[in-house]
């Protein structure tokens, strides 16, 4: 049996480099979040297909590359690390949640696991295979990318438990 342990990761844990659709050529591009010395966050768009590199504003953010219709909803991920996180969560038959150690009242809903949509985290997920197939197709859509442009995949602990 596969086990997933909540490590209290937040959505911002995955948002330092996003895979997006290039607004100029439609190919897969990336947006890097850069924190300046003044504390200002900048978004730098880079596309290896059309060789564009420019700063973009928050409100001009291109659509995510890793998104597809799934189970009547949209499954999306910022990057492959985020996609792997979702995949490991969906695959797991045992999901362990823990409270935020800094939270005085116990549980906190800052954890990405607690903020996943209900259709994705349902324990009796009848659409598990469909979700995993969509994840696989999203992963394959980004296989052609240069490995130096992709974020390192997360080392999400998924354990095998003896029955």
Task: Go through each PLM region and give its residues.
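Arginine residue identity/basic-tract feature
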Residues: 3-7, 11, 17, 24, ...
